[in-house]
Amino acid sequence: MIGIDIVKIDRISRLKARHGELFLKRFLSDDEIALAKNDATLAGFWAAKEAASKALGVGISKECGFLDIMISKSTKGAPKIKFSPRIYTNFNIKEASLSITHDGGFAVAAVMIV
């Protein structure tokens, strides 16, 4: 299963400016907030979680919320993705991979789940 998402970085910047920490905590864990050094990274994390939920075929919903999807980085800075235990079980996930890119004011993410 493959999911992709694109988001304008400015959109995430505006939401963060308007709602501050409440906005961040709606879709990120404390560890993810600590990793996100700028709005481009925040937008990439948003796109990654949306792409993952699309790969599962449910979108962000009761079946898979933002906080069921966890983004981290490898020692070399590459993005990594994990899911909550219930998501692994409910969707029979064996492996997942994530790619995030930023260009022209956009963040794009692709997630592959097997």
Swiss-Prot record:
Principal EC category: transferase
One BP term from GO: fatty acid biosynthetic process
Residues noted as binding Mg(2+) in the record, renumbered to the chain: D5, E50
EC numbers: 2.7.8.7
UniProt keyword annotations, A-Z: Cytoplasm, Fatty acid biosynthesis, Fatty acid metabolism, Lipid biosynthesis, Lipid metabolism, Magnesium, Metal-binding, Transferase
GO terms, molecular function: holo-[acyl-carrier-protein] synthase activity; magnesium ion binding
GO terms for cellular component: cytoplasm
Compartment(s) of residence: Cytoplasm
Cofactor dependency: Mg(2+)
Function: Transfers the 4'-phosphopantetheine moiety from coenzyme A to a Ser of acyl-carrier-protein.
Family: Belongs to the P-Pant transferase superfamily. AcpS family.
UniProt keyword annotation of Chaperone present: no
Reaction catalyzed: apo-[ACP] + CoA = holo-[ACP] + adenosine 3',5'-bisphosphate + H(+)
Gene responsible for this protein: acpS
Phylogenetic lineage: Bacteria, Pseudomonadati, Campylobacterota, Epsilonproteobacteria, Campylobacterales
Species in which this protein is naturally found: Campylobacter concisus (strain 13826)
The protein's name in its UniProt record: Holo-[acyl-carrier-protein] synthase
HAMAP family: AcpS (MF_00101)
